[in-house]
């Protein structure tokens, strides 16, 4: 087949904090099916994936495990690469952000952007989410928590370098409007435009000083380069980009990328930050960024503590690699989230793979052996007008499917493409019911018609298997082997009758997919859930013990104040208060106003803890209150006491609460 040119495809690189679950692996399987399909179409495909290995979260994970960050990422990167191999992923490059050539290029990119004025030095003060490694302003928080993951954020203030995002915002808006295919699906484009670009971009923090596990800034080594500027550039460093203008021929051939395939949760970074970085470097933008939906577990996000995390290796061990590939590709809608449970995988395996496909192949080969010793000949005989009609309809369905599949794949509607392919197998099964080979076999005069029917079935199956290859490569090869033929190139799939007449199929057909006992499936799932919950509980206990040991080892010295007399202390009245309601003080960035029940009274107390607690988190807490503090107005709001807090060396505040449950109003003495 004549080459159609290059096709450069990437996935988001996997974060090496922990072993990924099947929801994470979905993306790499989706990308692999696209890469394989494009290769069969005649494109010169380069498929890159890899691992994102820097950041504070990894540093903390390694510290908790008592190993170095490099040891941690080496281990997890090995696990991720092993899962790629297990899932039969045909990547061309596996990049790691700890690769020496990548790190050097990131440093050169940072220096170049700094030298040309796109990066400047400043100071950052805001709310930081460690799991997402993202800074947020208070206005961006949702109920006081990270808008991306819903996790706890902490105030952070540090010297940092910033990228001038607003400088390129108008250019990016123009590009998006002029290239409607750039962000897909369209709903993701609308989200980026309305929520981020049109309201105005803020400058982006691109370095950190509060941790060390990252790529140092060459001219200011106490700073490490922020994860997104590090991770995103893998798409160009992995194919030979050089910030000094000495990029490789491979880079010149492959860039711009034809497709960045990513999860919908990181589309902002890939459709705003990344294209702006490229504009600053004077490089073309990727042709398309596709934000795929999530694969949920039983309708909810996967959680180890709930015991509902599903790992690819467990699924493959039980169902087989192609059954897993088929399920995650077939069950993921174009925009909405998909759903996975062991029961659903088993049901789909039984209905589509064991019955529709496996039974069809087995019956066809078995009948060929039974009636003709395995020899398949094209007699091209129709005995009746109806024979001609059903043969023509079968051939039209089989040869017309390729164009439909190509159209679906052009839109990245992979699930729909698979549905079209299985339409061939369903039509073949219907053809068996229409032609009734077992009836034809009873009449020797109809032997040539019987041979024609079996030939048509074999021809339909091999065309379907050839289309199926990008999605289920092992299964497609097994089918071709049993039919004693080869999988076909795509330019042959609109022709019917290329199977060599007189070929002999295997005399021992194998079961492609065995039917599964649903009771056994449920038992296996329950065993894994129980083991996971137990492991999660043990892990939480270990973390709690580690935190306790760490707390015992930590101590803070503060500057002592002047001594006071006991009588001075005795003047202060401390009581337990219960917060019954709380709200933010208007026009204040720091203050919360709480209604606090103390005995039979309710007092209004204003506290500067908005950066540490949301109003919702405050309600219901038992706190220690200085009751007889003289009332005062804070930001125009009357405060009738003081809620006590502890403060660590980093300025983090924690409410002081009684160790045991005490009634509101109990005296603290």
Segments predicted by a language model, with ranges:
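Short secondary-structure capping/junction motifs at helix and strand boundaries
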Residues: 88-96, 114-127, 139-140, 154-157, ...
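Intrinsic disorder at enzyme termini
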Residues: 476-568
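Helix-rich, typically C-terminal accessory recognition domains appended to large enzymatic cores
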Residues: 121, 344-380, 397-505, 626
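N-terminal catalytic cores of NTP/NDP-binding nucleotidyl/phosphoryl-transfer enzymes
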Residues: 2-76, 95-111, 115, 132, ...
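Cys/His-rich short segments
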Residues: 116-169, 173
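A glycine-rich helix N-cap at a beta->alpha junction
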Residues: 78-92
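Phosphate-backbone binding interfaces of nucleic-acid-interacting proteins
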Residues: 548-669
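Structured secondary-structure scaffolds
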Residues: 2-49, 101-105, 155-370, 417-421
């Amino acid at each position: 087949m004549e080459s159609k040119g290059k096709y450069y495809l990437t996935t988001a690189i996997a974060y090496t904090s922990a072993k990924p679950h099947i929801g994470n692996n979905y993306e790499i399987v989706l990308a692999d099916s696209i890469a394989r399909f494009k290769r069969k179409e005649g494109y010169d495909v380069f498929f890159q994936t890899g691992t994102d290995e820097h950041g504070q979260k990894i540093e903390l994970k390694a510290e908790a495990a008592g190993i170095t960050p490099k040891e941690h990422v080496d281990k997890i990167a090995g696990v991720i690469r092993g899962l790629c191999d297990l899932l039969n992923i045909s990547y061309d490059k596996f990049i790691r952000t700890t690769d020496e050539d990548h790190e050097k290029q990131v440093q050169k990119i940072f220096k170049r952007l700094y030298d040309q004025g796109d990066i400047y030095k400043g100071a950052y003060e805001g709310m930081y989410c460690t799991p997402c490694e993202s800074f947020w302003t208070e206005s961006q928080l949702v109920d006081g928590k990270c808008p991306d993951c819903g996790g706890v954020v902490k105030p952070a203030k540090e010297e940092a370098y910033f990228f001038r995002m607003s400088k390129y915002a108008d250019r990016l808006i123009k590009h998006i409007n002029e290239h409607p295919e750039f962000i897909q699906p369209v709903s993701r484009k609308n989200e980026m435009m309305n929520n981020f670009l049109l309201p105005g971009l803020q400058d982006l923090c691109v370095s950190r000083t509060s941790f060390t596990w990252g790529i140092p800034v060459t001219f200011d080594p106490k700073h490490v380069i922020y994860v997104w500027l590090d991770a995103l550039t893998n798409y160009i460093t992995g194919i030979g980009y050089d910030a000094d203008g000495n990029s490789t021929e491979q880079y010149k051939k492959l860039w711009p990328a034809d497709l960045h395939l990513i999860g919908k949760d990181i589309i902002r970074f890939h459709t705003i930050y990344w294209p702006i970085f490229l504009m600053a470097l004077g490089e073309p933008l990727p042709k398309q960024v596709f934000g795929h939906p999530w694969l949920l577990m039983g309708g909810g996000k996967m959680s180890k503590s709930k015991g509902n995390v599903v790992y690819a290796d467990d699924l493959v061990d039980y169902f087989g690699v192609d059954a897993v590939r088929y399920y995650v590709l077939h069950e993921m809608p174009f925009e909405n989230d998909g759903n996975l449970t062991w029961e659903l995988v088993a049901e789909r395996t039984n209905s589509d793979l064991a019955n529709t496909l496996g039974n069809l192949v087995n019956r066809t080969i078995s009948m060929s052996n039974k009636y003709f010793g395995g020899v398949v000949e094209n007699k091209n005989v129709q005995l009746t007008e109806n024979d001609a009609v059903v043969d023509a309809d079968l051939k039209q369905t089989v040869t017309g499917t390729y164009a439909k599949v190509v159209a679906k794949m052009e839109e990245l509607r992979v699930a729909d493409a698979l549905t079209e392919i299985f339409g061939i197998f369903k039509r073949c099964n219907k053809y068996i019911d229409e032609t009734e080979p077992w009836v034809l076999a009873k009449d020797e005069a109809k032997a040539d018609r019987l041979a024609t029917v079996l030939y048509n079935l074999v021809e339909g199956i091999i065309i379907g298997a050839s289309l199926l290859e990008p999605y289920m490569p092992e299964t497609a090869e097994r089918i071709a082997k049993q039919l004693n033929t080869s999988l076909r190139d795509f330019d042959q799939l609109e022709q019917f009758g290329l199977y060599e007449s007189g070929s002999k199929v295997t005399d021992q057909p194998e079961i492609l997919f065995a039917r599964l006992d649903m009771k056994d499936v449920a038992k296996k799932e329950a065993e894994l859930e129980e083991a996971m919950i137990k492991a999660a509980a043990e892990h939480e206990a270990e973390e709690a013990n580690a935190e306790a040991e760490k707390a015992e080892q930590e101590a803070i010295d503060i500057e002592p104040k002047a001594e006071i007399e006991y009588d001075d202390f005795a003047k202060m009245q401390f009581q337990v208060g219960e917060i019954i309601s709380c709200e933010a003080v208007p026009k204040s960035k720091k203050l919360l106003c709480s209604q606090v029940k103390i005995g039979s009274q309710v007092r209004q107390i204003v506290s500067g803890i908005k950066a540490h607690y949301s109003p919702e988190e405050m309600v219901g807490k038992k706190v220690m209150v200085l009751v007889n503090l003289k009332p005062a107005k804070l930001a125009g709001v009357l405060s009738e006491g003081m809620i006590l807090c502890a403060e660590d060396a980093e300025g983090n505040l924690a409410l002081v609460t009684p160790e045991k449950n005490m009634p509101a109003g109990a005296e603290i003495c």
